[in-house]
Every structure is written in C-alpha cells, then in structure tokens.
UniProtKB/Swiss-Prot annotation:
Keywords: Cytoplasm, Initiation factor, Protein biosynthesis. GO terms for biological process: ribosome disassembly. Pfam families: IF3_C (PF00707), IF3_N (PF05198). PANTHER family: TRANSLATION INITIATION FACTOR IF-3, TRANSLATION INITIATION FACTOR IF-3, MITOCHONDRIAL. Monomer. The keyword Repeat does not apply. It comes from Campylobacter jejuni subsp. doylei (strain ATCC BAA-1458 / RM4099 / 269.97). This is Translation initiation factor IF-3.
Amino acid sequence: MSKEKEVLLNEEIRADEIRCVGDDGKVYGIISSDEALEIANRLGLDLVMIAADAKPPVCKIMDYGKFRYQQEKKQKEAKKKQKVIDIKEIKLSVKIAQNDINYKVKHALEFLEQGKHVRFRVFLKGREMATPEAGVVLLEKIWTMIENEANRDKEPNFEGRYVNMLVTPKKA
C-alpha cells in the first residue's frame, strides 16, 4: 500500500454501517455504506473514511482531490515554517597561539552573522586531561572576544576529551 493511499474511499469502504457527515457539515447519521455511497455519487463527490477506529466508522462526503490538495498544502506550509538549526563547530587545542584564536574567532563571528550556532571544542591531549581547566580558561578568553555578538547557550562543560561551549547569534 502506497503512502498516499492511507484513507479508504468509495467502494473500498467495507463496513456495513457508517456514521456519515456531508461536505457542508450536514449530519446524515448512521446509514449503510451503500446508501452513503449513493448520496456521494448523486452529489458528484467521494465518500472518504475519516475515522476507521470509531464504532461505527466515520465517513465524510467530500471532494477527495480537493481534500488531498489541501493536506499537501498544509504539509508544505508546515515544512516551510520549520527552521533548521545549523551548528558550526570550531576545534581548538589548549596550546593554540593568539593569532590562531583571532582567526577562529573571526570565522565564528561570520557564522553568527549568518544566523548559525557555533560550538567551540577544545580537544585535550595526553597530560592536558589532568588539567581540563585550561580548556575552560581558553573558552572564557574566546567568550570575552565574542560576547557582544552572541549569547552563550551552554557554559563550558566537559565531555570526554573535549571542553565544549555553544553560542548562538544575538537577536536583532
């Protein structure tokens, strides 16, 4: 069964009795599916099963093509309104030089201007694991350079061999 054919319509409805509602909101009550199909054909519309789990099943007399079009339109609108959060990651080490920090901060500011989130990751190697505070100090130093352009989403925290900090762009 294809994804589009999730609803039963017209002759596919096998229930003996159904609760029928018209396209204009008129309630036909509990009638046989043959009778409902006859009403739908007379009006030039389709009989569409709305709630198969109900006792008796609920069907609606409507234009199925128009209904499907409206459903697809709603899905497209919902998809447009979804905002994908893009997170850029900038990797650093504890022994990074100041000019390299400036270069990485410049890139981070470009990402923030584009509306992207930035995660700073300080990788701790070997003996640096004994003093992870050095990573926190480095991230605090970077934070002082970008605090006018960004909001700190997460304080510097430890995750395994990394010290992470997440920053987001300031709202205009």
